[in-house]
Amino acid sequence: MQTLDDYDREALARVLSESSATDNPDADRIHRLVRRAIDIAVVGMSRDPSKAARRVPSYLAAKGANVIPVNPHADRILGKDARPTLADVTEPVDMVLVFRPSELAGAVVDQAAGRPERPIIWLQEGIRADEAAARAREQGLDVVQDLCMYKVHRALGDTRRRVEERGAAARGD
């Protein structure tokens, strides 16, 4: 399993420090969670390409994630059938990525926590649902709040590229 070296950990720690949530997993755990998230249900995914709720999932899809749009007001997003609710996502998912206002996010966290595959629950930057997150954590689920998946993914991608560059330089490539 790939682990973070001090350089990678520092880059990710800078992004993690932007979150107001003090109970998020540490950098090593975040790294493992992001690496295992391939099938991602995006609750609140937007049809509007200018919104973060569309840009972030688009980026993840471009990086190889299977993004499943969840939006009751859309038929298709990014060429995929949108599901009206998280309950309508019948296939297993590794992560539920939430783009809903904080006052509505708790219900989504509770729904995600009830899924049999026990997905990672990730509330995007600016979104918190402390009580629901605590309930999910009590069930042993990984919950991340108030943290931008794009920024984390980019930090990990950037550090991977730097590691590759350092390796190439060491080999004399």
Task: Pin down the residues of each PLM region.
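Alpha-helix C-terminal capping/helix-to-coil transition sites in glycosyltransferase folds
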Residues: 36, 91-92
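NAD(P)-binding Rossmann-fold cofactor-contacting core
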Residues: 46, 50, 57-78
